[in-house]
Amino acid sequence: MGQRRIKIRLSESSVRNAINELNQYKEEIQSKAQEYVNRLSEIGIQTAKGNVGNFGRYIVFSKEIDPNKYGCKAIILATETGKIVSKWQTKDGINSVDVSPLLMAEFGSGHRAQNPENVPGVGQGTFPGQEHAEDPSGWYWKDLDGNLHHSYGVTPTMPMYKALVEMETNAMKIAKEVFG
């Protein structure tokens, strides 16, 4: 976009022309702001889609773009298409819990989910009622056929966090491309 100069003389028609040029410039900036947030949000969505691990079929990413008088705002949304029903056997019978694929992808569970990126304020993901989440030895569980399995938990793939990092990394580059 570069610098724009508006020349004005002290006449009614010159002032009117300057106002028209300013309004046109305002629309141009608004359009560029929309392009900017659209491109950044697309980078975020593509990054998030590439970091969902085995939960990809349960998570849909989209964006909402809201142009307003102050510029433009974009929000990236991660929506679940459903819950995963996890079932296992215990001495008391079959247990079941609905698991959020979105939370599992973002935060993981168990010992493997100890905030691998050291994101401030993010704790270790756990299953509801988990007793062994912080046990470095992991835990054992029986499937519905009675077979014993060992687990350390689910490693988080952090799709939304990685989307944020990628957008931050590209913010200046995209701004230069869009605004010049």
Regions found by a protein language model. Give the residues of each.
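Short, Lys/Arg-rich flexible segments
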Residues: 1-83, 112-180
